[in-house]
Amino acid sequence: MRIAAVPFPVAAGVRLHGEVIAWTCSGVAVRHPDLVAALRDAGLDEGVARELAPKHAFARACKKLGEQRIIRRVAEDGASMKFQFTAEHRSDDRFEYTLETLLTLDKRSGLVSCDLPGLATAAQERLDCALGVRTASDVTRVIGKLFDRHADLFPIRPQGGCYFVPERHAGFNDRVQAMLGRIGGRILRFPFPAGTAEGTGA
């Protein structure tokens, strides 16, 4: 991970109020075990990277399965969910819709079944991928949970993305930085000197 230069040098011994930080993990796609390992190696709480439930993973899988078809949930109970797959075709100046199949998802095992073997295989592959991979949005939520549980994070702007962290949490920032570096992300850290009567001392 490349550490960006701070906007100004801070002399040794200068007291800091804290740091302004921002992070990016755009494009990151990391296997769940690798994310857990990165958290563990950085001395962070592994519990923030929970397993993804099959029902939530299937919602992600549907985004890739939904090309030229409409997928709708039609039934759900404690053990399973049932989805209707409807193919969409354009004919001249109108769209036509044809029922493809009803697909069942076992909410406990994560197994899917339907009467179209090819579609069942594709759906299972997409689901397994979604279960095993964490996206940039997932990593951002993990970082948010870490700070919620272990450090103070004050937003600089209403929409988030840039935060002030008090100096007492500098060591925690170090660990988050190490974790992000392991999975291809970056954190930018800008020191906020406490200053003196003569100026910042920076």
Label for each model-derived stretch:
Residues 2-106:
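Charge-rich interaction surfaces and accessory domains that mediate macromolecular binding and assembly
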Residues 2-11, 21, 30-49, 57-62, ...:
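Terminal interaction module
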